[in-house]
Amino acid sequence: MSIQEKLSTALAFHQQGQLLEAGELYREILAEDPDQVDALNLMGVVMQAAGDLEVALDLLGRATELAPDYFAPFANLGNVLQASGRLLDAVEAFETALKLNGDSPETANNLSSVQNELGNPIAGLEASERALSLIPQFPEAIINKGNALLALARPVEAVNAYREALTLAPDNARAHFNLGNAYLDLEAYAEAVEPYLKSVTLDDRNAKAWFNYANCLVELDRIDDAVGCFQRALSIEPDYVDALCNLASALQSLGQTGDAIDLLRKALISQPDSPDLHWNLSLTLLQHGDYSQGWREYDWRWKMPTFEDYRRDFDRPKWDGGPLDGRRILIQAEQGFGDCIEFCRYIPMVAAMGGEVVLECRPELNRLLGTLDGVAKRIDLGAPLPEYDVHTPLMSLPRIFNTDLQTVPSDIPYLDVPKDAILDHAVLSATGLKVGLVWAGSPTRRDNHKRSCGLQALTDLMSIERVDYFSFQVGPEASELQNDPLFAGVADIAAGFSDFADTAAAVADMDLIISVDTSVLHLAGALGKPVWGMLSTPTGFLWMNDRLDSPWYPTLRLFRQPQPGDWDSVVAEVCSALEERLAKSPQG
């Protein structure tokens, strides 16, 4: 056979998918004529299909050198360069190909794909629209258009693009996967479930699809299902660090902290300097009760993006826990009100090291913290700093004092009611068991909707007699009280609080506080008042696993959700406990 006859036969094999047979003929041709451009080009395609990208690059590179005006080798070279991760070179190859043949929708679409991969969504969108101008019903180009739109923070348009692609190619796993991603971007988690499920059904070897599907299920509190999906992702990619991390978080939510710790330690072998992994490990260790290691890992919080607002530059050294010998130490309260109330218990211990303590705190806590032993001076957060010698963040003190479960400082009360605090007359005139209520946490917390039970969940409490209820609820949720006649008997005293000193005065006069996980719960515990905490599942790491008490607050009793979102069971248990208390001691 002549070279041309061999080429025709090889091309027929190639088009029928018989790549081995085609490859043999291409080799024969190149043995006879090493510069046969068509054979170089097509053999390059065969070698890419075989996974030998280096040989493919060599063949296609020679073809483009021999025929610089030939479209096909440049288009195919772009594909191999993209597969090799040489994305900028791939862009150059595709753009050269399009200069030679501007009517190639496939090449324009491939250029869109690589531009999106490079993080150039504007160029990616332009290239996909060029492809679609040539073939309007081109599913892959529509998908790439959606990817560009999603990267440009235009998720609604991306959803429409993916849906359009799916009308043309309903079994395209990538379109279903990306539609799920767009819904995830919109925080439309319920809508994301179906496309993710369809995606992993069509392509069950896509680890990223299983991973994103699992993340979606976590947001919907379907933690058990999410665990299975994370495990599927890891069965495909055992060293998928993000999947290891998120599976650990899911297991932590389920209270399986031992397994979660093992996963995080495995992930840290691959990424030993990952702030995310160390931060999650710290929370998991603390929830597990391993305080000695957990508080050491907790210092990684300063490398987390979520702590950026708390990071500060100081011109004095950090305190290492050694004797202070009369030096002035600046302690910065950090994170939420409840965190400050809980961990300010360490300040008398700092003062006992021989130092003069200056406490920087949020203004709402300033008066209350004036009752804390060991504080020489208080300043509001944001005010000019006085002179100081060393400093430390408040929540580094458990590590500095080597706190473990047996050495948690639990002498209460460690806070008191300031003498100038104002008490509402409604509290003074109450005759029944005085019970304070809080049904929602801080609206600035991402998980607040899970931690908060809502006023309606407390309906059954209203039928219990000989109880005077008082609302300690602040923020937007406080208005729920005025909008529901069922709760007309609840006195709203929180509106009169100017700061936590006034809150403390009211808490001190209660017989019992019933609260979700929020600052009032911590305040009641710090004041030594009986307090019942209603906890969501998952819950805060400091409440540990399954415990109904806490080493931090001896007067605290915990009521836990048996399943995520199940506030009915929690409130039913609280009602039974309250009736039992009334039966034993009607006066509280």
Regions found by a protein language model. Give the residues of each.
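Alpha-helical solenoid repeat scaffolds of the TPR/TPR-like class and their adjacent stem/linker regions
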Residues: M1-L512, D517-G588
